[in-house]
Curated annotation (Swiss-Prot):
GO terms for cellular component: cytosol. Involved in transcription antitermination. Required for transcription of ribosomal RNA (rRNA) genes. Binds specifically to the boxA antiterminator sequence of the ribosomal RNA (rrn) operons. This is Transcription antitermination protein NusB. The keyword Ribosomal protein does not apply. The keyword Transcription applies. Belongs to the NusB family. The lineage of its organism: Bacteria, Pseudomonadati, Pseudomonadota, Gammaproteobacteria, Enterobacterales. It comes from Serratia proteamaculans (strain 568). Keywords: RNA-binding, Transcription, Transcription antitermination, Transcription regulation. GO terms for biological process: DNA-templated transcription termination; transcription antitermination. One of its GO terms (molecular function) is RNA binding. HAMAP family: NusB.
Length: 138
């Protein structure tokens, strides 16, 4: 699959995870609704589904990885930043095929696209502290 399709999968995953985090609906329902309402012709659907289900199943673990380095309580973290960080940490922890730098750079780009003005700096700072303990740089 092309890198652009993977990027679109991550973009869609941020949006769907944002919805899931706010609604607390079943992740399968969120996925179904998202796919029925969005134009996903240029999206790696398999990867989108894996990110969505993988982050949902491992949300507690992913949150526990980031919580110690946050400058605020996890509950105070913005929903966009939380979704972006969960995706990046999932890729670093569970997807050895995704290069270290790709996971971090993609998270920064997602934060620039969807987050508040300086959220990409926050995301970069958190990942800079957490990522080396999850996986060695390559």
């Amino acid at each position: 699959m092309k890198p652009a399709a993977r990027r679109r999968a991550r973009e869609c995953a941020v949006q769907a995870l944002y919805s899931w985090q706010l609604s607390k609906n079943d992740i399968a329902d969120v996925e179904h609704q998202f796919l029925s309402e969005q134009d996903v012709k240029d999206v790696d659907i398999v990867y989108f589904r894996e990110l969505l289900s993988g982050v949902a199943v491992n949300a507690g673990l992913l949150d526990s990885l980031m919580a110690p380095v946050l400058s605020r309580q996890l509950e105070e973290l913005g929903q966009v930043e939380r979704a972006v960080l969960r995706i990046a940490l999932y890729e670093l922890k569970m997807r050895e095929d995704v290069p270290y730098k790709v996971a971090i750079n993609e998270a920064i780009e997602l934060a620039k696209t969807f987050g508040a003005e300086d959220s990409h700096k926050f995301v970069n700072g958190v990942l800079d502290k957490v990522a080396p303990s999850i996986r060695k740089k390559k």
